[in-house]
């Protein structure tokens, strides 16, 4: 429903967002900020191992997986687990229009974060901001849970 109203006398909120956003953020970015490179890898039933490794070899410091359904890693599961084990954050998101990516031991390996309901594009931006703020994967997951 409506969060509130924007009228000539000001903005009135009746419902506040549950997640942090915009000015209520821990991230500090200015014109001189260079964010870490994050690549989005689209995964489907015909995805072949090697594409995620190629992105890392080309300079990606983090990866966002645009998976099917609930963020499935498809044929890239072992490759992505190895990349995450090397300390390169991997965020699981979905390329479908709705739904959440939840933490689940069947799909998620150590070093991976669940992107909740964020699109792959929003996940890539948040992962870059999170990586600038921390290299700790638990802290990065907390940021994905918060925004």
What are these regions (language model features)?
Residues 1-71:
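Accessory alpha-helical/coil subdomains and C-terminal extensions
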Residues 71-147:
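ATP/nucleoside-binding phosphotransfer catalytic cores, i.e., glycine-rich phosphate-binding loops
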């Amino acid at each position: 429903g409506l969060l509130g109203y924007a009228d000539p006398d000001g903005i009135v909120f009746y419902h506040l967002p549950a997640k942090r956003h915009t000015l209520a953020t821990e991230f500090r970015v200015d014109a001189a900020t260079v964010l870490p490179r994050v690549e989005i890898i689209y995964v489907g039933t015909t995805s072949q191992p090697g594409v995620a490794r190629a992105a890392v070899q080309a300079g990606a410091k983090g990866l966002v997986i645009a998976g099917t359904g609930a963020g499935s890693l498809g044929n890239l599961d072992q490759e992505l687990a190895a990349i995450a084990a090397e300390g390169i954050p991997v965020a699981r998101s979905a390329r479908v229009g709705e739904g959440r990516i939840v933490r689940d031991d069947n799909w998620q390996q150590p070093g991976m974060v669940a992107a909740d309901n964020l699109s792959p594009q929003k996940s890539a931006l948040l992962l870059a901001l999170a990586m600038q703020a921390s290299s700790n994967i638990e802290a990065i997951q907390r940021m994905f849970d918060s925004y």
